[in-house]
Protein backbone atom coordinates (compact mmCIF):
# COMPACT_ATOMS: atom_id res chain seq x y z
CA UNK A 1 0.00 0.00 0.00
CA UNK A 2 1.34 3.40 -0.98
CA UNK A 3 1.16 6.04 1.73
CA UNK A 4 1.26 9.79 1.68
CA UNK A 5 4.12 11.51 3.47
CA UNK A 6 3.82 15.03 4.85
CA UNK A 7 7.23 16.46 4.01
CA UNK A 8 7.88 18.81 6.93
CA UNK A 9 6.53 16.29 9.46
CA UNK A 10 8.79 13.58 7.99
CA UNK A 11 11.79 15.91 8.24
CA UNK A 12 11.01 16.63 11.92
CA UNK A 13 10.57 12.94 12.72
CA UNK A 14 13.95 12.18 11.17
CA UNK A 15 15.79 15.30 12.37
CA UNK A 16 18.47 13.25 14.14
CA UNK A 17 19.48 11.64 10.83
CA UNK A 18 20.56 14.98 9.39
CA UNK A 19 23.38 15.62 11.85
CA UNK A 20 27.05 15.09 10.87
CA UNK A 21 28.64 12.91 9.77
CA UNK A 22 25.70 11.36 7.85
CA UNK A 23 23.61 14.51 7.21
CA UNK A 24 21.12 12.83 4.85
CA UNK A 25 18.24 10.37 4.73
CA UNK A 26 16.22 8.90 1.88
CA UNK A 27 12.45 9.27 1.92
CA UNK A 28 12.17 7.01 -1.16
CA UNK A 29 14.75 4.77 -2.80
CA UNK A 30 13.08 3.36 -5.88
CA UNK A 31 13.53 4.52 -9.49
CA UNK A 32 13.42 8.01 -8.00
CA UNK A 33 15.70 8.82 -5.08
CA UNK A 34 13.96 11.39 -2.87
CA UNK A 35 16.41 12.50 -0.18
CA UNK A 36 16.79 15.27 2.35
CA UNK A 37 20.17 16.66 3.36
CA UNK A 38 21.18 18.71 6.40
CA UNK A 39 24.49 20.20 7.47
CA UNK A 40 27.11 21.32 8.10
CA UNK A 41 28.93 19.48 5.36
CA UNK A 42 31.82 21.24 3.61
CA UNK A 43 33.33 19.20 0.78
CA UNK A 44 36.28 19.40 -1.57
CA UNK A 45 35.21 16.53 -3.84
CA UNK A 46 33.16 16.98 -7.01
CA UNK A 47 30.51 14.47 -8.05
CA UNK A 48 29.74 13.81 -11.73
CA UNK A 49 26.83 11.73 -13.02
CA UNK A 50 25.02 11.06 -16.28
CA UNK A 51 21.64 12.04 -14.85
CA UNK A 52 20.28 15.34 -13.55
CA UNK A 53 19.59 16.49 -9.99
CA UNK A 54 16.82 18.67 -8.57
CA UNK A 55 17.67 20.84 -5.56
CA UNK A 56 15.16 22.63 -3.33
CA UNK A 57 15.99 24.39 -0.07
CA UNK A 58 13.39 23.95 2.65
CA UNK A 59 15.39 25.63 5.43
CA UNK A 60 18.30 28.04 5.08
CA UNK A 61 20.68 28.48 2.15
CA UNK A 62 23.33 26.30 0.52
CA UNK A 63 26.11 26.72 -2.02
CA UNK A 64 26.47 24.37 -4.98
CA UNK A 65 30.02 24.67 -6.27
CA UNK A 66 30.19 23.71 -9.96
CA UNK A 67 32.72 23.49 -12.76
CA UNK A 68 30.93 25.34 -15.54
CA UNK A 69 32.54 25.74 -18.95
CA UNK A 70 36.00 25.35 -17.42
CA UNK A 71 35.43 27.76 -14.51
CA UNK A 72 34.78 26.99 -10.86
CA UNK A 73 31.89 29.03 -9.50
CA UNK A 74 29.43 29.04 -6.63
CA UNK A 75 25.69 28.77 -7.21
CA UNK A 76 23.81 30.01 -4.11
CA UNK A 77 20.48 28.20 -3.60
CA UNK A 78 18.46 30.13 -1.05
CA UNK A 79 15.59 29.02 1.14
CA UNK A 80 12.52 28.39 -1.01
CA UNK A 81 14.49 28.22 -4.26
CA UNK A 82 14.46 25.32 -6.73
CA UNK A 83 17.27 24.46 -9.14
CA UNK A 84 17.91 21.85 -11.83
CA UNK A 85 21.51 20.73 -12.27
CA UNK A 86 22.15 19.41 -15.80
CA UNK A 87 23.77 16.03 -16.34
CA UNK A 88 27.56 15.66 -16.53
CA UNK A 89 28.38 18.82 -14.53
CA UNK A 90 31.00 18.42 -11.76
CA UNK A 91 29.39 19.69 -8.55
CA UNK A 92 30.25 19.93 -4.88
CA UNK A 93 27.43 20.74 -2.40
CA UNK A 94 28.39 23.03 0.48
CA UNK A 95 25.86 22.89 3.31
CA UNK A 96 25.69 24.74 6.59
CA UNK A 97 24.34 24.14 10.09
CA UNK A 98 20.57 24.41 10.60
CA UNK A 99 19.75 24.00 6.92
CA UNK A 100 17.65 21.41 5.11
CA UNK A 101 17.52 20.64 1.41
CA UNK A 102 15.62 18.28 -0.87
CA UNK A 103 17.60 16.47 -3.59
CA UNK A 104 15.99 14.31 -6.28
CA UNK A 105 17.93 12.02 -8.58
CA UNK A 106 17.21 8.70 -10.29
CA UNK A 107 18.41 5.12 -10.30
CA UNK A 108 21.38 4.71 -12.63
CA UNK A 109 21.17 2.61 -15.77
CA UNK A 110 23.49 -0.39 -15.82
CA UNK A 111 25.55 1.31 -18.52
CA UNK A 112 26.07 4.54 -16.55
CA UNK A 113 29.05 5.58 -14.45
CA UNK A 114 29.48 8.18 -11.73
CA UNK A 115 32.73 9.98 -11.03
CA UNK A 116 34.27 11.49 -7.91
CA UNK A 117 37.01 14.01 -8.53
CA UNK A 118 39.36 16.31 -6.68
CA UNK A 119 40.91 19.19 -8.59
CA UNK A 120 44.21 21.01 -8.16
CA UNK A 121 43.04 24.24 -6.51
CA UNK A 122 40.71 26.23 -8.76
CA UNK A 123 42.05 24.72 -11.97
CA UNK A 124 40.60 22.08 -14.29
CA UNK A 125 43.58 19.82 -13.54
CA UNK A 126 42.43 16.59 -11.93
CA UNK A 127 44.29 15.64 -8.75
CA UNK A 128 42.46 12.36 -8.03
CA UNK A 129 39.45 10.55 -9.48
CA UNK A 130 37.45 7.34 -9.23
CA UNK A 131 34.72 6.12 -11.59
CA UNK A 132 32.12 3.59 -10.47
CA UNK A 133 28.63 2.27 -11.11
CA UNK A 134 26.49 3.91 -8.45
CA UNK A 135 23.99 1.78 -6.57
CA UNK A 136 24.08 3.54 -3.19
CA UNK A 137 25.87 6.87 -3.20
CA UNK A 138 25.66 7.12 0.59
CA UNK A 139 27.79 4.02 1.13
CA UNK A 140 29.98 4.19 -1.97
CA UNK A 141 31.36 7.72 -1.55
CA UNK A 142 32.89 7.37 1.92
CA UNK A 143 35.51 4.70 1.01
CA UNK A 144 36.61 6.73 -2.04
CA UNK A 145 36.96 9.88 0.05
CA UNK A 146 39.00 7.97 2.64
CA UNK A 147 41.18 6.53 -0.12
CA UNK A 148 41.92 10.06 -1.30
CA UNK A 149 42.84 11.27 2.19
CA UNK A 150 45.35 8.41 2.49
CA UNK A 151 46.77 8.91 -1.00
CA UNK A 152 50.06 10.30 -2.24
CA UNK A 153 48.07 12.84 -4.24
CA UNK A 154 46.53 14.25 -1.07
CA UNK A 155 49.90 14.35 0.69
CA UNK A 156 51.77 16.05 -2.15
CA UNK A 157 49.01 17.97 -3.95
CA UNK A 158 50.26 16.50 -7.23
CA UNK A 159 48.35 14.12 -9.54
CA UNK A 160 49.59 10.71 -10.59
CA UNK A 161 49.00 10.59 -14.38
CA UNK A 162 49.03 6.78 -14.32
CA UNK A 163 45.91 6.79 -12.11
CA UNK A 164 43.89 9.20 -14.26
CA UNK A 165 41.70 8.11 -17.16
CA UNK A 166 43.12 8.89 -20.57
CA UNK A 167 39.57 9.25 -21.90
CA UNK A 168 36.45 10.02 -19.87
CA UNK A 169 33.38 7.74 -20.01
CA UNK A 170 31.46 10.79 -21.30
CA UNK A 171 32.26 14.44 -22.06
CA UNK A 172 31.54 17.07 -19.43
CA UNK A 173 28.52 19.25 -20.10
CA UNK A 174 29.22 22.60 -21.77
CA UNK A 175 25.75 24.16 -21.51
CA UNK A 176 25.21 27.21 -19.31
CA UNK A 177 23.66 26.56 -15.92
CA UNK A 178 20.34 28.22 -15.12
CA UNK A 179 19.78 30.38 -12.06
CA UNK A 180 17.87 29.00 -9.06
CA UNK A 181 14.38 30.47 -8.74
CA UNK A 182 11.84 30.97 -5.98
CA UNK A 183 9.30 28.17 -6.26
CA UNK A 184 6.52 30.14 -4.58
CA UNK A 185 7.11 33.23 -6.72
CA UNK A 186 7.03 31.09 -9.88
CA UNK A 187 3.79 29.38 -8.84
CA UNK A 188 2.19 32.69 -7.83
CA UNK A 189 3.21 34.23 -11.15
CA UNK A 190 1.48 31.43 -13.08
CA UNK A 191 -1.57 31.00 -10.84
CA UNK A 192 -4.06 32.20 -13.45
CA UNK A 193 -2.88 29.63 -16.01
CA UNK A 194 -2.75 26.85 -13.44
CA UNK A 195 -6.28 27.49 -12.20
CA UNK A 196 -7.47 27.57 -15.81
CA UNK A 197 -6.37 23.95 -16.03
CA UNK A 198 -3.04 24.40 -17.83
CA UNK A 199 -0.14 22.30 -16.51
CA UNK A 200 3.24 24.03 -16.84
CA UNK A 201 6.83 22.79 -16.86
CA UNK A 202 9.21 24.67 -14.56
CA UNK A 203 12.30 23.84 -16.60
CA UNK A 204 11.01 23.30 -20.13
CA UNK A 205 11.21 20.21 -22.29
CA UNK A 206 14.94 19.93 -23.01
CA UNK A 207 15.76 17.88 -19.89
CA UNK A 208 15.07 14.31 -18.82
CA UNK A 209 13.71 15.79 -15.58
CA UNK A 210 10.15 17.04 -15.73
CA UNK A 211 8.92 19.17 -12.82
CA UNK A 212 5.34 20.00 -13.75
CA UNK A 213 3.07 22.41 -11.88
CA UNK A 214 -0.63 21.48 -11.93
CA UNK A 215 -3.71 23.48 -11.00
CA UNK A 216 -7.27 22.19 -10.84
CA UNK A 217 -8.08 19.35 -13.22
CA UNK A 218 -7.22 15.69 -13.55
CA UNK A 219 -4.53 13.47 -15.02
CA UNK A 220 -3.81 9.78 -15.10
CA UNK A 221 -1.04 7.25 -15.65
CA UNK A 222 0.82 4.93 -15.62
CA UNK A 223 4.32 5.94 -16.58
CA UNK A 224 5.67 2.51 -17.46
CA UNK A 225 9.35 2.87 -16.60
CA UNK A 226 9.58 5.79 -14.18
CA UNK A 227 8.23 6.76 -10.77
CA UNK A 228 6.09 9.87 -10.35
CA UNK A 229 6.50 11.91 -7.17
CA UNK A 230 3.58 14.17 -6.29
CA UNK A 231 3.89 17.08 -3.85
CA UNK A 232 0.82 19.12 -2.93
CA UNK A 233 1.62 22.82 -2.50
CA UNK A 234 -1.81 24.43 -1.99
CA UNK A 235 -5.40 23.23 -1.77
CA UNK A 236 -6.30 19.57 -2.06
CA UNK A 237 -6.32 16.64 -4.45
CA UNK A 238 -6.94 12.92 -4.40
CA UNK A 239 -5.13 10.03 -6.04
CA UNK A 240 -6.92 6.78 -6.84
CA UNK A 241 -4.70 3.75 -7.43
CA UNK A 242 -4.61 0.10 -6.48
CA UNK A 243 -8.17 0.24 -5.17
CA UNK A 244 -7.46 3.00 -2.66
CA UNK A 245 -8.16 6.71 -2.64
CA UNK A 246 -5.45 8.88 -1.09
CA UNK A 247 -6.29 12.46 -0.15
CA UNK A 248 -3.49 15.03 -0.37
CA UNK A 249 -3.45 18.24 1.69
CA UNK A 250 -0.78 20.99 1.54
CA UNK A 251 2.75 19.58 1.98
CA UNK A 252 1.57 15.97 1.49
CA UNK A 253 3.59 13.92 -0.98
CA UNK A 254 3.06 10.57 -2.66
CA UNK A 255 5.30 8.31 -4.74
CA UNK A 256 3.48 6.56 -7.59
CA UNK A 257 5.67 3.56 -8.51
CA UNK A 258 6.61 2.92 -12.13
CA UNK A 259 3.91 1.07 -14.04
CA UNK A 260 1.14 1.87 -11.55
CA UNK A 261 -2.23 2.97 -12.94
CA UNK A 262 -3.56 6.04 -11.17
CA UNK A 263 -6.02 8.90 -11.51
CA UNK A 264 -5.14 12.25 -9.91
CA UNK A 265 -8.03 14.66 -9.37
CA UNK A 266 -7.21 18.20 -8.23
CA UNK A 267 -9.84 20.45 -6.67
CA UNK A 268 -10.37 24.15 -7.36
CA UNK A 269 -7.54 26.10 -5.73
CA UNK A 270 -5.19 23.12 -5.89
CA UNK A 271 -1.54 23.69 -6.78
CA UNK A 272 0.73 20.65 -6.90
CA UNK A 273 3.96 19.41 -8.44
CA UNK A 274 4.74 16.16 -10.22
CA UNK A 275 8.36 15.10 -10.69
CA UNK A 276 9.73 12.47 -13.09
CA UNK A 277 13.21 11.66 -14.32
CA UNK A 278 13.13 9.56 -17.46
CA UNK A 279 16.52 8.39 -18.81
CA UNK A 280 14.82 7.70 -22.15
CA UNK A 281 14.78 11.51 -22.53
CA UNK A 282 18.58 11.77 -22.25
CA UNK A 283 20.12 13.91 -24.95
CA UNK A 284 22.96 12.36 -26.99
CA UNK A 285 26.32 13.86 -25.99
CA UNK A 286 28.32 12.77 -29.00
From Swiss-Prot:
Highest taxon listed in the record's lineage: Eukaryota
Reactions the enzyme catalyzes: 3-hydroxyanthranilate + O2 = (2Z,4Z)-2-amino-3-carboxymuconate 6-semialdehyde
Binding locations of substrate: 53, 95, 105
Ranges where the record places region Linker: 161-177
Positions of region (Domain A (catalytic)): 1-160
Record pathway: Cofactor biosynthesis; NAD(+) biosynthesis; quinolinate from L-kynurenine: step 3/3
Cofactor: Fe(2+)
InterPro entries referenced in this protein's UniProt entry, alphabetically: 3hydroanth_dOase, 3hydroanth_dOase_met, RmlC-like_jellyroll, RmlC_Cupin_sf
Listed EC numbers: 1.13.11.6
NCBIfam families, per database record: anthran_nbaC (TIGR03037)
Function noted in UniProt: Catalyzes the oxidative ring opening of 3-hydroxyanthranilate to 2-amino-3-carboxymuconate semialdehyde, which spontaneously cyclizes to quinolinate.
Descriptive protein name: 3-hydroxyanthranilate 3,4-dioxygenase
Phylogenetic lineage: Eukaryota, Metazoa, Chordata, Craniata, Vertebrata
